Swiss-Prot record:
Induction: Expressed in the early phase of the viral replicative cycle. The gene is OPG034. The keyword Ribosomal protein does not apply. The lineage of its organism: Viruses, Varidnaviria, Bamfordvirae, Nucleocytoviricota, Pokkesviricetes. This is Protein OPG034. It comes from Vaccinia virus (strain Western Reserve). It comes from the Viruses.
Amino acid sequence: MVKNNKIQKNKISNSCRMIMSTDPNNILMRHLKNLTDDEFKCIIHRSSDFLYLSDSDYTSITKETLVSEIVEEYPDDCNKILAIIFLVLDKDIDVDIKTKLKPKPAVRFAILDKMTEDIKLTDLVRHYFRYIEQDIPLGPLFKKIDSYRTRAINKYSKELGLATEYFNKYGHLMFYTLPIPYNRFFCRNSIGFLAVLSPTIGHVKAFYKFIEYVSIDDRRKFKKELMSK
């Protein structure tokens, strides 16, 4: 009986090791974990060519978060993307990762009523802003997010007026600070605020302001919140 238990434990242990050795996050982390702080800063700046980084991400993003974002944004090519990024350090790395199915494009999940793991939040927000600007009927999942826009209209009416004046004067919101306090509702309130402005400033400018303002960590937290509903 004792012998059987040991065999079973060994099988479980070997299985866990196999999962860890084939998990893309773990494979990519092996290449990042020994980088110096200066080297990692170079990696972050090079990553901005492939990932949506907010202003705060350049100083606060961790290696784990960066890896998770690369895997999520490029599930079939995360190894190639990391290899390209590492060229900024004059390092030629070889990352062998088995690819998986590509995530669903936002245009296909418009009929879904719940957020899923394979949906990118950036895709969701970009398409949502476009739907609002172009007055396209919203599916169930987008209707949930649209409640944040309604809330923003009631909560930030004065601030929205000032933002519109700023845009009409300068033609952009590049140096405009969103009047959204940083708390657990920061991401959803930012989405709601920018959604109200989307018909005025255009969905592209609204989306890039969202990326500039909301960090990857905050986006990931919000995605988990959406998935839990």
